[in-house]
Amino acid sequence: MTTWPATTEYAGSSAHLTELLAAIAAGQQDALAQLYHLTRTAVYGLSLSYLKNTHDAQDITQDVFVHVWDHAPQYRPTGSPMGWLLTVCRNLCLMRLRRTERHAVLSEAEWDAIPQQETGLTTEERTLLQHVLSRLGEEERRIVLLHAVTGLKHREIAALLELPLPTVLSKYHRAIRKMRADLEGDNAHDK
């Protein structure tokens, strides 16, 4: 059994993820477990942003890693391994949405179902984050979450969402301004 070194980066370095995908392609199940451990939060976060339902997001997260196991030999290390993983996730989410044609808003109970240790936020911070994110448009929210949660660069987000880079940049900066204004407004009310 191969042991993989732990990484201090959130989802692992690109080189480390590429090594894991190569090991998965060679049939090493422990590499899949390591990849899952390093990337599950980002994959789950993206699926939740598309599906707005914790049960469906959990299903898709599981499906992503089954897909990775089945298709790792097809991964070409010329691109970002995290980008490939999130593209798989996005495609599975879009297929699910086409099947169910469901675009619901994430309920408070579903926000509460996200494990607190996964986010590292207190209940109060999670509530505030939920409020601020709910005021953003769908695409703005997805771009902010992809950048903040997965650490993807804006050009990677543009490729993943199939949007022009200037559009991603403007939507990201607009979303940050909206969030800042909301937070400053909340702080003004507290004083």
Question: Where are these predicted regions, by residue range?
Answer:
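Short, charged helix-capping/linker segments at alpha-helix termini
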Residues: 2-11, 25-34, 44-63, 156, ...
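Short, basic/polar amphipathic helix motif occurring as a linker/hinge flanking DNA-binding modules
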Residues: 96-120, 124, 190
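Arg/Lys-rich amphipathic alpha helix in sigma70-family domain 2
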Residues: 70-77, 86-107
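Structural recognition of an alpha-helix C-terminal capping motif at a helix-to-coil junction
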Residues: 45, 59-66, 79-91, 170
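Conserved RNAP core-binding helix
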Residues: 16, 37-40, 44, 54-71, ...
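DNA-recognition helix of helix-turn-helix
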Residues: 90, 94, 140, 149, ...
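C-terminal edge and immediately downstream basic/flexible tail or linker adjoining helix-turn-helix-like DNA-binding
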Residues: 1-12, 23, 109, 122, ...
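Short helix-capping/turn signature of helix-turn-helix
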Residues: 37-41, 49-52, 135, 145-152
